[in-house]
């Protein structure tokens, strides 16, 4: 559980400190989602419950869809502006 908390805090710090680069913001959000998934899996294992493992599969699927949508928006943003920096 400590590992998932550390990963979540790294994701929050990465999101806050890298406000200029969209790719690093998306990666930070993914780290936060995977930290939550790890916490759900560990809790599911400790309580001997299969629903947590099923829920973690849904979280991973949503994280993949979120990454695909975010990268699609990033490509459109690059075509419109010519760079991916937020502050220009």
Swiss-Prot record:
Membrane spanning residue stretches: 22-42, 57-77
GO MF entry, a single one: NADH dehydrogenase (ubiquinone) activity
Broad class of where this protein is predominantly found: mitochondrion
Catalytic activity entry: a ubiquinone + NADH + 5 H(+)(in) = a ubiquinol + NAD(+) + 4 H(+)(out)
Keywords for the protein's UniProt record, in alphabetical order: Electron transport, Membrane, Mitochondrion, NAD, Respiratory chain, Translocase, Transmembrane, Transmembrane helix, Transport, Ubiquinone
Enzyme class: translocase
GO cellular component entries: mitochondrial membrane; NADH dehydrogenase complex
Single GO BP term: ATP synthesis coupled electron transport
InterPro entries linked: NADH_UbQ_OxRdtase_chain4L/K (IPR001133), NUOK/Mnh_C1-like (IPR039428)
Keyword Transport: yes
Keyword Transmembrane helix: yes
EC number assigned by the record: 7.1.1.2
Highest rank taxon of the organism: Eukaryota
Membrane disposition: Multi-pass membrane protein
Localization in the cell: Mitochondrion membrane
Role according to the record: Core subunit of the mitochondrial membrane respiratory chain NADH dehydrogenase (Complex I) that is believed to belong to the minimal assembly required for catalysis. Complex I functions in the transfer of electrons from NADH to the respiratory chain. The immediate electron acceptor for the enzyme is believed to be ubiquinone.
Record family assignment: Belongs to the complex I subunit 4L family.
HAMAP family assigned to the protein according to its UniProt record, in alphabetical order: NDH1_NuoK (MF_01456)
UniProt-recorded name of the protein: NADH-ubiquinone oxidoreductase chain 4L
């Amino acid at each position: 559980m400590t590992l998932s908390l550390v990963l979540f805090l790294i994701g929050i710090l990465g999101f806050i400190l890298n406000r200029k680069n969209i790719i690093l913001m998306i990666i930070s959000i993914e780290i936060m989602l995977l930290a939550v998934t790890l916490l759900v899996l560990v809790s599911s294992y400790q309580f001997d419950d299969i629903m947590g493992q099923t829920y973690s599969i849904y979280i991973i699927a949503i994280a993949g869809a979120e990454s695909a949508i975010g990268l699609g928006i990033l490509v459109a943003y690059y075509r419109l502006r010519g760079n991916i920096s937020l502050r220009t």
